[in-house]
Each structure stands twice: as structure tokens, then as C-alpha cells.
UniProtKB/Swiss-Prot annotation:
Gene Ontology CC terms: ribonucleoprotein complex; ribosome
This protein's UniProt keywords: Ribonucleoprotein, Ribosomal protein, RNA-binding, rRNA-binding
GO biological process: translation
Gene that this sequence comes from: rpsH
Family the UniProt entry places it in: Belongs to the universal ribosomal protein uS8 family.
Single GO term (MF): rRNA binding
Pfam families cross-referenced by the UniProt entry: Ribosomal_S8
Function of the molecule: One of the primary rRNA binding proteins, it binds directly to 16S rRNA central domain where it helps coordinate assembly of the platform of the 30S subunit.
Matching NCBIfam families: PRK00136.1 (NF001109)
Name of the protein described by the UniProt record: Small ribosomal subunit protein uS8
């Protein structure tokens, strides 16, 4: 079955696995997904991730992170720009996620970066998702 929005599918798999208390989740691999997951790791939302290969099909295994009370570090993860409704903003218009406690992930001409890094680099782009 083909997926019309693979990024939203990945975010949904991570959200569902985190709410179910799973240790890890596998998502189909792509360069864009790899970049998004590496930002989630650098921002402290996941423990780790690694590439898994089975019979030519590549997957990314994402190891989820939980706090002391065994609740997920990811309280919410939401797709902003979809294939049917693209959202582009300049660097001056980039919104803050939960008053700066969340992270905005933006696809820019300099690659996929956080909203904070996009503001510092003075580049706008397509809003991929927000995490808090």
C-alpha cells in the first residue's frame, strides 16, 4: 500500500509508539526522514537511531526516550506542511512552538534545520513539523 505523505506516516508511527510505551519503532528510510530524525536526536526527543537493512529494504530504527516517570519525552508531534497544503514562511515569520519549549523543523535552501537555526541563518522555508 502506498502512503501519500510518508513524513506524516513516520511522525504518526513515532507518536503512536511513544504513547504505547514501546522502546523503539521502525520507519521506512529516506534521506529526508534521516535528517528529521537526526534533528529529533540532537534536540533530545529520542535516545538514538540506526539504519536497518533487510533484503534490500532500508528502515530506520528509532529508540524512543522516556523520563523518570516513564512518560514519553515527546508530548506532541504534528505535521505542518502537507502535500495538499504546503506552508512556506520567511525567517521573520517563523512561529515559536510552545513559547520556545518546542522545536520547529524547517526545510530550507541550507537543508533541514530547526526553526531557531533558520532564524539565526536568516533563511525561511517549508515548515515540516513541530515537536514539543
Amino acid at each position: 500500500m502506498s502512503v501519500s505523505d510518508p513524513i506524516a506516516d513516520m511522525l504518526t508511527k513515532i507518536r503512536n509508539a511513544a504513547s504505547a510505551g514501546h522502546e523503539s519503532v521502525d520507519v521506512p528510510s529516506s534521506k529526508m526522514k534521516w535528517e528529521i530524525i537526526s534533528i529529533l536526536k540532537s534536540e533530545g526527543y529520542i535516545k538514538n537511531f540506526k539504519k536497518m537493512t533487510q533484503e534490500g529494504a532500508g528502515n530506520i530504527r528509532v529508540f524512543l526516550k522516556y523520563d523518570d516517570k516513564e512518560s514519553s519525552v515527546i508530548h506532541g508531534i504534528e505535521r505542518v506542511s502537507t502535500p495538499g497544503r504546503r506552508v512556506y514562511l520567511g525567517y521573520k515569520s517563523l512561529p515559536r512552538v510552545f513559547n520556545g519549549y518546542g522545536t520547529l523543523i524547517v526545510s530550507t535552501s541550507k537543508g533541514i534545520i530547526t526553526g531557531k537555526a533558520a532564524g539565526e541563518s536568516q533563511v525561511g522555508g517549508e515548515l515540516i513539523c513541530k515537536v514539543w
